[in-house]
Amino acid sequence: QAVRYADGYTYDIETGQVSSPYTGRVYETKGKAPFYGFGFEHPYHYYPGYYHGYPHAFY
């Protein structure tokens, strides 16, 4: 079961993985719940930095 955010990111509830619509990469969330902030809906993941709407890296 997956959760799709307004920005296109998807969060898989069972595996805890996040998929990026921009790069196609899959990020590990290490079991952390999705995070809401910065005026955008972004899940936890390990993308380095916050540029042009890309989410921060949350640990």
UniProtKB/Swiss-Prot annotation:
<keyword id="KW-0193">Cuticle</keyword>
<dbReference type="Pfam" id="PF08184">
    <property type="entry name" value="Cuticle_2"/>
</dbReference>
<protein>
    <recommendedName>
        <fullName>Cuticle protein 7 isoform c</fullName>
    </recommendedName>
</protein>
<dbReference type="GO" id="GO:0042302">
    <property type="term" value="F:structural constituent of cuticle"/>
</dbReference>
<keyword id="KW-0873">Pyrrolidone carboxylic acid</keyword>
<dbReference type="InterPro" id="IPR012540">
    <property type="entry name" value="Cuticle_2"/>
</dbReference>
<feature type="modified residue" description="Pyrrolidone carboxylic acid">
    <location>
        <position position="1"/>
    </location>
</feature>
